[in-house]
Curated annotation (Swiss-Prot):
Name of the protein this chain belongs to: Protein twist
GO molecular function, one term: protein homodimerization activity
GO biological process, one term: mesodermal cell fate commitment
Sequence ranges of Basic residues compositional bias: 54-64, 339-351
Record's function text: Involved in the establishment and dorsoventral patterning of germ layers in the embryo.
Gene name linked to the record: twi
């Protein structure tokens, strides 16, 4: 089934007849010719023409569209021509370009010149349109587009496609045409307001280009007015950093001795900034180590490399050196400039982790050996003490009990020597039975009240008496048992 939808034919753009394009609007007119759709098959009613004549403020825009549509009919083939060759289905290729994108590329001057050309051709287009239409309708009616009272194109029955359901659907090419015709009066009003926007360069390269080519950008020929910094805000050495960047286009005009003077001045300021960091006692008895010196050398080399990178190779390290100095800044640490070198000081070698671990383990082993020796010697002392002190076979003394028994034995010996218990020994020998524990108290009292004459005679005759250990042990055992019995009674 053949589609009843009317499509816009494919139109090729031919601008070969124009040798040059002096004005952008000439290209715009050629493009707008492709946008317009063939509208001669539609006729409008007469009452819409009366509304058009009442509004004179939109008459100029109507005539421009009328001229463009008439020019389009000269080049655009009719659908009947395609049908003559047996082509029923046309390729629906959309060549519509929004007019706002085309108009945005034009300048204000081109818009003004184009409007003048349009006004000059309005009278001729009106005459030709009236001559071509014998029926008495205006040229706008012959082109198939009418304008309402608001200066907009009124929709006709041809703009809608009758589908099978009976609903009216606006064709896409007609929608685009209406949208373009609504935007074109707004674009013309903007061109008539004569609004000029000056483009101010914002980068250093554009400023340099504007200064070298003053004829291209006449709106901003003095970049100093936009990049005027007060002198007190920039230090002297930082002003030289901006010098190669800002005067990149003026290097051919500068003198060589001025550039050398600026480089020498920057070098002196750079040296002074580093000399301020050196302490007064840095040469003799310095507290700085070799690592501090290496860090300072590394920072100095990084600073020099960054300065050379900012200058873009203009200030090389070779030109930083003074003519009368023995060496440059880069050769100061190697060629004899010992300003930053500190005297080396031998540090104690720090032991490694394995050495520290071995030393700690050895110390721990020696401490354990000493502890075992001390405990062993203490046990030996207690054993010897238990052998000296008279004990009973049933005694199982701890270390504390052994010490207490030793104090009691010492007390017993002191009493024996002070109270002349020699008589007690004689009494024990007279009884001959060491099992008489019941008379121990009487024996002790007799010893306390014994005759001193006998003791003195024995001392004078035989000297100090010698008491055998077994007898002392027996007496201590008797005294100990009596003391325990008295303690229990109390």
């Amino acid at each position: 089934m053949m589609s009843a939808r009317s499509v816009s034919p494919k139109v090729l753009l031919d601008i070969s007849y124009k040798p040059t394009l002096p004005n952008i609007m000439e290209l715009q007119n050629n493009v707008i010719k492709l946008i317009q759709v063939e509208q001669q098959a539609y006729m409008q009613s007469g009452y819409q023409l009366q509304h058009q004549q009442q509004h004179l403020h939109s008459h100029q825009h109507h005539q421009q569209h009328q001229q463009q549509q008439q020019q389009h009919t000269q080049y655009a083939p009719l659908p009947s021509e395609y049908a003559a060759y047996g082509i029923t289905e046309l390729e629906d290729t959309d060549y519509n370009i929004p007019s706002n994108e085309v108009l945005s590329t034009s300048s204000n001057q081109s818009a003004q010149s184009t409007s003048l050309e349009m006004n000059n051709n309005n009278t001729s287009s009106n005459n030709t349109s009236s001559g071509n239409n014998p029926s008495g309708f205006d040229g706008q009616a012959s082109s198939g587009s009418s304008w309402n009272e608001h200066g907009k194109r009124a929709r006709s029955s041809g703009d809608y496609d009758c589908q099978t359901g009976g609903s009216l659907v606006m064709q896409p090419e007609h929608k685009k045409l209406i949208h373009q015709q609504q935007q074109q009066p707004q674009q013309q009003q903007q061109h008539q307001q004569h609004i000029y926007v000056d483009y101010l360069p914002t980068t250093v390269d554009e400023v340099a280009a504007a200064q070298s080519c003053p004829g291209v950008q006449s709106t901003c020929t003095s970049p100093q007015s936009h990049f005027d910094f007060p002198d007190e805000e920039l230090p002297e050495h930082k002003a030289q950093v901006f010098l190669p960047l800002y005067n990149n286009q003026q290097q051919s005009q500068q003198q060589p001795h001025q550039q050398n003077h600026a480089q020498m001045h920057f070098q002196n300021a750079y040296r002074q900034s580093f000399e301020s960091y050196e302490p007064a006692n840095s040469l003799n008895g310095s507290a700085y180590s070799s690592s501090d010196r290496d860090d300072m050398e590394y920072a100095r080399h990084n600073a020099l490399s960054s300065v050379s990178d900012l200058n873009g190779g203009v200030m090389s390290p070779a030109c930083l050196a003074d003519d009368g100095s023995a060496g440059s800044l880069l050769d100061g640490s190697d060629a004899g400039g010992k300003a930053f070198r500190k005297p080396r000081r031998r540090l104690k070698r720090k032991p490694s982790k394995t050495e520290e671990t071995d030393e700690f383990s050895n110390q721990r082993v020696m401490a354990n050996v000493r502890e075992r020796q001390r405990t062993q010697s203490l046990n030996d002392a207690f054993k010897s003490l238990q052998q000296i002190i008279p004990t009973l076979p049933s005694d199982k003394l701890s270390k504390i009990q052994t010490l207490k028994l030793a104090t009691r034995y010492i007390d017993f010996l002191c009493r024996m020597l002070s109270s002349s218990d020699i008589s007690l020994l004689k009494a024990l020998e007279a009884q001959g039975s060491p099992s008489a524990y019941g008379s121990a108290s009487s024996l002790l009292s007799a010893a306390a009240n014994g005759a001193e004459a006998d003791l003195k005679c024995l001392r004078k005759a035989n000297g100090a008496p010698i008491i055998p250990p077994e007898k002392l042990s027996y007496l201590f055992g008797v005294w100990r048992m009596e003391g325990d019995a008295q303690h229990q009674k109390a």
